[in-house]
Amino acid sequence: MKPKILFFLLLVFPQFISAQAFRNYSNEFLNIGVDAAALGMSKTVVATSNNVNSIYWNPAGLVGIDDYQGSIMHASYFAGIANYNYAAFAMPIDKESAVAFSIIRFGVDDILNTTELIDNQGNIDFNNISLFSAADYAFNVAYARNLIFKDLKFGVNAKVVRRIIGDFASSWGFGFDMGIQFERND
């Protein structure tokens, strides 16, 4: 390859692979992360993930599992006001492919609903206080397989995102992730 073309590719290509760095504030709960080991390494496991938690980090890593795997995580935020829960299950289909499922929930429970606190006569009635929850959910399903070369793995992840804020509001969303891993063992 000519040096000028190589220089151009090295200059332009990194602009397209910054998908992990782009953030917005919608569904920010999906950026918290899973797996204590991965979080302890400052989330630098995208290229090396090869277990059930690959459904979150890089679905291509699911090809690395040999047997059924499960993962459960719980974390409390803001002195226990908010809770983050994660559960995942993965299994190999054959030597070349695997499938996984996961659910993530980030929620605040037992929020006081005071919209009915004052009755029609303007009196405060504490019996009208009720509780509600505000929660975000992500349901994921992933498939991964070895491609033409045994060293090249490909994975895809489809997710459905659900937000529920008591009886006041709810919404649905969806997304897709794709990942590749190349491992060269000489």
Language model region names:
Residues 1-22:
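Bacterial Sec-dependent N-terminal signal peptides
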Residues 20-186:
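Subset of outer-membrane beta-barrel
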